[in-house]
Amino acid sequence: MNISGNWEKRRIETFEHLGSIGRSAFARSISNKAVEFILGLFPLLERLVGVPRFSDYPFSLGVASGDPLPDGVVLWTRLAPEPLAEDGRGGMPSGRVFVRWEVADDEGFRRVVRRGMESAGPEMAHSVHVEVGGLQPNRHYFYRFKAGSEISPVGRTKTVPAPGGAVAQMRFAFASCQMYEHGYYTAYGHMSEEDLDLVVHLGDYIYEYGINEYIASSGNVRRHDGPKIFTLPQYRNRYALYRSASNLRAAHAAFPWVVTWDDHEVENNYADGIPGGTGSVDEFLRRRAAAYQAYYEHMPLRRSSVPQGPDMLLRRRITYGNLAEFNVLDTRQYRNDQAAGGGLDPPNPEQRDPSRTITGKAQERWLFEGLGRSRSRWNVLAQQVFFAQRDLRSGPNEVFSMDAWDGYLGSRNRILGFITERGIRNPVVISGDVHNNWVANLKADFDDPDSLTVGTEFVGTSITSGGDGADTNRRAQGIIAENPHIQFFNGQRGYVRCVLTPESFRADYRVLPFVSRRGAPIHTRASFEVSDGQPGAQQVGGEPIPAIPGVDRIPAAIELDGERIEAQQRANRES
């Protein structure tokens, strides 16, 4: 695409003072006729500056929506005709490109209710984040983008109900940990066919390792696109590689997503400005800035989350009528360094230091303020790492993960104390990170099995990380025996589907028999339910995956914390 420098300058000047036509504040301040008038100038602009020409289909990374409100949602795409171009620009020129967008009541776009235009530029990898406003609460909509003569795939999204509005039911799924090399994204194909209002992603969307550095017990089945990543072009290309999977694109296009990160979006086990591996703090902060920018460029996030160098505001709330409120946490960016080196360690003074925090003081205050004001039936903490206490060694000598909330007892005690003292209604924690399914009751005192149960934690397995899993083994059952507040374990891949009503919160553990080959069926391994006003989960259904006729038995292993940490440490040594 050849664009005259003068016209490019005039084009930018014309639209920078308006902001973007898609910005909700501007869209609300002008009439639909004014929008139609400005969009009517688009053919003239294209004749003046040239219709963009792409070397290949520019919407190769698909479309997505996220962070829904009662009157709007964020729409996302990125122009990338050559998504793995070495310079990280996706095959795009250095100039800006107009991208039109439409929102309609119907999939055929006969009833378009909102439309607008964004200017996509190289500073954000030609990504587009449209904050659409003026929509109706609790409604499905269809959306698409246009650039030049090219049209994107159609996405489907949904707004949330009006604040305080009565809601009979909500359905959402949560997922995490999708190491590309460890397996195929079959789970996302099944998820895209579910009837959901929302998807919550709890982190480890990408992995930073080079080719075959982190090897699954069942073997790696795909290859990363290059060595371990450090620079902005490398992080951009890693997201592009993961988005090359059609099942992941389908799940993004099917529902609005609410995303947060864990560690592998930057580097394994980092803590605030402290790298998880070697290197100086300055080097790590440069790397973190590149990683955060690439994350924003590839997620349906609002402009309030635009990174400022190595800092990015990710915590936020999503309220679903009077039924549920989601407090989306960031437990990486503000935490103290992991105690005792950050591995599996016995109790220690650093772990017990009440001043240490996994959320940071400001985010903890924000959480308490939100929980204290909430009038929702279900109060959900969407976060990354295992929240409940989990002694990982049988016998009298305890061992805990210092990277999880077990390494930050002060933070956990303050949250559980606040929930108990303030009588927060129906707290439920959803977590990822550990590549296995767990269910745990949250106790006022984990060392006293008879102490008050104050909440519930549902921990979801990985999409692929760890490779083919297995239902359970002796060591996993030993952990359950050592921790009487833990009710369930499963070591297979998949996601968790949740159904909320005013009376109950049900979590269905949806699992696959394998991810090392394509085409695995989905199965509900277990269903657990929390009743309104009665903290703690009860199993209400599910059974092990039955034998699959005609499918050879696939050798599988369970990757518990020790194996996972060892494999990732080996990956760090390899790199």
Cite the ranges covered by each PLM segment.
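Metal-dependent phosphoester/phosphodiester hydrolase catalytic core
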Residues: 2-575
